[in-house]
A protein has these predicted regions:
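Membrane-interface "cap" regions at the ends of multi-pass membrane proteins
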Residues: 1-28, 57-62, 66-91, 246-250, ...
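Inter-helical loop and helix-membrane interface segments of multi-pass membrane transporters/permeases
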Residues: 2-5, 33-37, 67-92, 105-165, ...
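Membrane-embedded translocation segments of transport machinery
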Residues: 2-3, 7, 169, 173-321, ...
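Helix-loop-helix connectors at the membrane interface of multi-pass transporters/channels
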Residues: 4, 108-140, 244-248, 253, ...
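Loop-to-transmembrane helix boundary motifs in multi-pass membrane proteins
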Residues: 6, 12-14, 20, 142, ...
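Select transmembrane alpha-helical segments in multipass membrane proteins
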Residues: 6-17, 42-45, 84-98, 146-152, ...
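Transmembrane helix-boundary motif of multi-pass solute transporters/channels
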Residues: 11-49, 198, 236-242, 253-256, ...
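C-terminal membrane-solvent junction of multi-pass transporters and transport-like membrane proteins
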Residues: 89, 94, 339-353, 385-443
């Protein structure tokens, strides 16, 4: 692409990259493990690992994207030394993006469906068992879930079809702005509930008893894993946005801004969840159960709960949708970079492909529920998530690390020159030994421990 599309503003790049990083884990995992492992004490350890783990790898993804001016499908071809095979990572990146969307679009559909369910008062008068029954009924209906999944896919690809600036950038900027506004409204409501102070104390005051009672090693690994996985690094989802920006600012400074926004969303989500749960005497829990059962049950009991419930699911939909739009943009760019197709044609082909590829995840909860690939009670979604989260993300991050530091790859000097071009925070040159030798070992440790915890 000689006439590479560009973001119209620096803010657009930062918000869209943050939108890609901000996902459902910020809401249904971060607050839970923060409470479990010691509140503010855990957050401090998490932030340290975010700087040590997530930030360097994200800078490398952005650097590869900006230097090559290509998506992950072609970026390694452009930068690798002649005769090497680094470009094989491009195929792994493509597989990772498609696999991620094969289950993420279904969950995005759940969020959109719950806006409608909450708005129409479907939860009114139900007890906790009734609220759980609504969720289980949705999972049992393949046609209903397919409708919402297709709606999410069509809306996202339509936005991408409008172009980078007029579609992706404009809509995502508006979406992220609304997301933060809704977050603030929900936080204010949550912390002013009677009894919310106990939840705030649990969440914000460092508790080194909880920090140590789970085992210091387990606590550190939990912080390490959250810091690594929150940014979805290793499959080129960030690299594409590096290819859409100029060289006015250093990439380390931009990455710091994105990490701060991602952390802010996760932190504010905790300010919604813990005060609310403590105010109503409910165990927060984690995962889909928190979002689709626990919180609707709380909104049921809250004055003005329907309004705040709708706002919450709009926020969750925006969090999911911002990631989906960002990854769809990456998928579209694969077709454009590899085959020279037009944006409209790439949208049409990939839109149909994603809908078809997302159906196994939908069916895995109902008509194909007998297929339990990860053991009793597991679903196709669990398998897809395992392939992406436990394999492609850590191994892909390892490739980016080695590619940017090894003389057999793009090399340290080329990486550092690209990362430091522009004004702003420079990547620390003294960290070469750390990112070349120590950080790959940490990522390898995360990869091995992921398997151990999954199959122990």
């Amino acid at each position: 692409m000689n006439n590479r599309e560009r973001f119209s503003s620096r803010l657009g790049f930062i918000l869209i990259s943050a939108g890609c990083a901000v996902g459902l884990g910020n809401v249904w995992r971060f607050p839970y493990i923060t409470g479990q492992y010691g509140g503010a004490a855990f957050v401090l350890v998490y932030l340290i690992f975010l700087v040590l783990l997530g930030l360097p790898i994200m800078v490398m993804e952005f650097s590869v994207g900006r230097a090559s001016q290509k998506s992950a499908a072609r970026s390694f071809h452009v930068l690798e030394p002649a005769g090497t095979k680094w470009h094989l990572q491009g195929y792994a990146c493509m597989a990772g993006n498609y696999l991620l969307m094969m289950f993420y679009t279904t969950v995005g559909g759940w969020m959109a469906a719950y806006i409608f369910k909450t708005l129409t008062g479907e939860f009114k008068g139900l007890d906790s068992d009734g609220v759980a029954a609504v969720f289980n009924d949705m999972l049992a209906r393949p046609g209903y879930m397919t409708f919402w999944m297709v709606l999410v896919v069509l809306l996202s690809f339509f936005i991408c079809s409008l172009g980078l600036q007029k579609g992706v950038e404009r809509i995502t900027k508006a979406m992220m702005s609304c997301l933060f506004l809704i977050l603030l409204i929900l936080c204010i409501r949550s912390v002013t509930l009677p009894g919310a102070s106990e939840g705030l104390r649990f969440y914000l005051i460092p508790d080194f008893t909880r920090f140590t009672e789970n085992g210091v090693g387990n606590t550190i690994f939990a912080a390490m894993g959250q810091a690594f996985f929150t940014l979805s690094l290793g499959i080129g989802a960030m690299a594409i946005f590096g290819s859409y920006i100029g060289k006015d600012h250093t990439l380390t400074g931009e990455t710091i801004n994105i990490c701060l926004l991602d952390t802010l969303v996760a932190f504010l989500a905790g300010l919604i969840i813990f005060p609310s749960c403590f105010a109503f005497g409910v165990d927060p829990g984690q995962g889909p159960g928190l979002v689709f059962i626990t919180l609707p049950n709380i909104f049921n009991q809250m004055v003005g709960g329907r309004i705040f419930g709708v706002l919450f699911f709009v926020f969750m939909t925006f969090a999911a949708q911002s990631t989906i739009i960002a990854v769809f943009e990456n998928i579209i760019s694969f077709s454009i970079d590899l085959f020279g197709t037009s944006r409209k044609k790439a949208v049409l082909i990939n839109g149909i492909a994603i809908i078809l590829l997302s159906l196994p995840c939908v069916f895995g909860f109902n008509i194909w529920s007998g297929f339990q690939p990860m053991g009793a009670g597991s679903t196709i979604q669990d398998l897809e998530d395992f392939i992406v989260s436990n394999n492609l993300l850590p191994l892909g991050s390892m490739v980016y690390l080695l590619f940017c530091t090894s003389r057999y790859g793009w090399g340290w000097k080329n990486f550092l020159a690209e990362a430091d071009t522009g004004k702003g925070v420079k990547f620390p040159a003294w960290a070469r030994v750390y990112v070349s030798y120590i950080l790959p070992l940490i990522v390898l440790f995360i990869f091995i421990m992921g398997y151990y915890q999954k199959f122990k």
